[in-house]
Amino acid sequence: MGAAVPPSHTVIAGGGLAGLSCARELGSGFTLLEAEDRVGGLARTEMVQGFSFDFTGHWLHARDAEIRALVEERWLRGNLLAVERRALVHSEGAWTEFPYQHNLHGLPARTVADCLIGFVQATAGEPGRALRERPLRDAAEFIQRHLGDGFARHFMLPYNRKLFTVPCEELSPEWGGRFIPRPTLEEVVRGALGIAPGGAGYNATFWYPREGGIEALPRGIAADLTTGEVRLGARIAALDLAGRRVRLASGEEIPYGQLVFTLPLSSVARLLDGPPDVIEAARKLRSVSVTVVEIGADEVGGKRFHWAYFPEDRFRFYRVGSPSEVNPGLAPEGARSFAVEFSHGGPIDPAPLAAHAVASLHELGLLDRARVRLVRWRTIPVAYVLFDHDHAAARAQVIAHLRRHGVHVAGRYGNWEYSSMEDAILSGRDAARALAA
């Protein structure tokens, strides 16, 4: 295999945002392995017939001062749009503002009453006392505890059942975190009366590139990689942790001194040959697949939004994005684009989903099916981590095994969590700093 590998030489598995951020922080002495023909992971953009589509919606939020400065002054300098979120919910024939729990105004009076009464009972009344005083068993109880029965029945339970493909009783209570806004009573009441101030939730404002789609971000980071090695088309087939080698699908073996792993943590089940308990734990790491139907159509008016949520069963999709509403440059003049998202637990025939998407958007007045220019789809096999009751223990066991062999995990999928693009960048940076510590 040639000369011995320096102990400091790092192999980075995966060229998404976390891997790129790690490589940038290291500066040199790394080999980044990316299976695809370009870096970026899921933060990539494709153009077809004048329409640009990201690999599902990617909106950039930068809370960390260092990352914010890098984005503004280096990676996307002069190429940033600051966008105020326009997100809606469609239910019971009405369009309401997102988050649902902050914006009941416009829904049927009975629904508003259900949600208000349920919220008060859950957070301050006697009916909710039991959940307030004991540990929560599952995500359904998390919702009941923090939002009440009305919000649970009318939005939270059906929407999350559609998104995660399993009942909320099968999910652990840890899944909510900072991504589910929990309003005060005053906020709920103001939202019911139509005087909510707006801006609730972690993504009320965001950045998006003026040109190049979201792929402009990983390209900007990659431009900083002036030393080190980036290898494209390098698909990892196996890991030899004891021998500190990565084997590629081509059969080539690449030795390393240190390894940063940003691939899906669940892939450990196929990449390692043991020990059995770790393989079994990795197999317990479940995820949801997403098929995105991308539609380009003549502009016909209709409701304006960046994205909208659909909790009702009559729509098989859980969310519809409109990229051209975020940045008109993502569609030809006189056209509008949509990304219709369907979650599923295994292989699925996308053609019926595409037909359903076009028919539904026609019904909603968002497009005219006779004036559709483009329909295509892509499937993301590992899209959302499933926070089921095995998640925490299985994740901890697999990560602990990797750490015992000097492997650092990074990114949304390496850490097996639900996180943002900024979180992925921070995770890669922190992994590099941990290697140097």
What are these regions, as identified by a protein language model?
Residues Y256-Q258, T262, S266-H408:
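C-terminal segments that line or cap access tunnels to active or ligand-binding sites in enzymes
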Residues H389-A437:
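C-terminal lid/capping helical subdomain adjacent to the catalytic/cofactor pocket in oxidative enzymes
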Residues A13, G27-V48:
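Glycine-rich FAD pyrophosphate-binding loop
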Residues A18, R38, S266:
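Conserved Rossmann-like nucleotide-cofactor binding loop
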